[in-house]
Amino acid sequence: MTTEMLVCDIETDGLLEQMTTIHCAVVKNYLTGKVTEYRPDEIEQFIRSLEGQVVIGHNWIGFDSAAIYQWCDMNDELFIGEFYPEPKMVIDTLVMSRLLNPDRERPQELPQRVGPHSLKAWGYRLGIYKGEYGEQDGAWDCFNEDMLAYCAQDVEVTTEVYKALCKEINDG
């Protein structure tokens, strides 16, 4: 199996404490640019696609990874006699942002409640916006194509955040 660098995001029906499902996921091969979208009936396939790969995600360690393990626990019949699929390595752009510049300033046009290391803040910084999906009541209750498009946009923003952070490292 060839190791690939995959920029990933998922959308769920709630935060970890309330989550009951992963609605969708989007994966972008960092080197080729190929994007793969996963709908609700393809989540197992998505999780298996991460096996042995380098995964890049924003808040992957704090949320996405934990949500995937929680989903696997809720669907353990799919993994009888095997370990849950695991990436070879995880690169979390939220962690990178905090480590490289703990005092990073929040873009002025954002409300105080938006953290300076958030994907939304990075989107403003880079001129690649996350989108507005999810601000309406019930937005995360059921899967829909707008949610998938929002997830895909998050992957695009995360890709550019990773590039910007690598540039910060290289520029010293």
Language-model region placement:
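Short amphipathic alpha-helix with an adjacent loop that forms part of the alpha/beta core around
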Residues: I43-S49
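Entry/capping segment at the start of metal-dependent catalytic domains
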Residues: M1-C24
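Active-site-proximal helix-loop-helix substrate-binding element of RNase H-like nuclease domains
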Residues: L16, V27, G33-P40, V54-D171
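RNA/tRNA-interacting regions in translation and RNA-turnover enzymes
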Residues: L6-V7, R48, T158
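A general structural motif
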Residues: T2-T3, E51-V54
